[in-house]
Curated annotation (Swiss-Prot):
NCBIfam families: PRK02886.1. The lineage of its organism: Bacteria, Bacillati, Bacillota, Bacilli, Bacillales. This is UPF0298 protein GTNG_0961. The keyword ATP-binding does not apply. Pfam families: DUF2129. Its main location: cytoplasm. One of its GO terms (cellular component) is cytoplasm. Keywords: Cytoplasm. It comes from the Bacteria. InterPro entries: DUF2129. It is found in: Cytoplasm. Belongs to the UPF0298 family. The keyword Cytoplasm applies.
């Protein structure tokens, strides 16, 4: 239903070119202090967009976001850890 999206972190030399990143995807965040932008595009186009962004003269570095590949379901604590002989508080 929804297309798979992936974030791309773009490190910039100057922020005045931040608006030019709109044509590569949806800009999610721009950090003025650290001079980077986070933009999202379709997963199928990530490699193509990263190559185009890296070729721009105002871009220092381009990194993909690894969030889609991380496991976000966490397991609960085991029974041993729940029944501690030393109560806290």
């Amino acid at each position: 239903m929804f297309p798979k999206r992936q974030g791309i972190i773009v490190w910039l030399h100057s922020l005045k070119y931040g608006k030019q990143l709109r044509k590569f995807g949806n800009i999610h965040y721009i950090s003025k202090r650290l001079k980077y932008a986070v933009l999202y595009c379709d997963m199928e186009q990530v490699d193509h967009v990263m190559k185009k962004l890296a070729a721009l003269p105002f871009v220092k570095r381009v990194e993909p976001s690894y969030r889609p590949f991380l496991r976000l379901e966490f397991e609960s604590k085991g029974e041993k850890e729940k029944d501690s002989p030393y109560p806290l508080g």
